[in-house]
A protein has these predicted regions:
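Short amphipathic beta-strand and strand-loop transition segments with alternating hydrophobic
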Residues: 11, 43-45, 74
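Acidic, low-complexity, intrinsically disordered interaction modules
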Residues: 24-68
Length: 77
């Protein structure tokens, strides 16, 4: 998926305080921008020069190459 598309989807989810799942061919990473939702991870950085997004996880950080993303599912609260 293109970096600009990923960033647009996630920034829209953030402004609407939504949550969802980023799916790659071998991994799913949950995220949440909902206030007070501590059960899921949060997107913390977009790096345009490498086209990677960083997700702060419970046990470790995830770094996802945008080209590896197959789908992003976004859900309303």
């Amino acid at each position: 998926m293109k970096f600009a598309t990923v960033k647009t989807i996630l920034m829209t989810a953030q402004s609407n305080q939504q949550h969802g799942v980023i799916k790659t061919h071998n991994n799913d990473v949950c995220f949440s921008f909902a206030n007070g939702d501590s059960d899921e991870d949060d997107i913390i950085a977009y790096k345009s020069d490498t086209e990677v997004i960083s997700v702060l996880g419970k046990a470790c950080n995830s770094y996802i190459d945008c080209e590896a993303i197959e789908t992003i599912e976004v859900y309303k609260q």
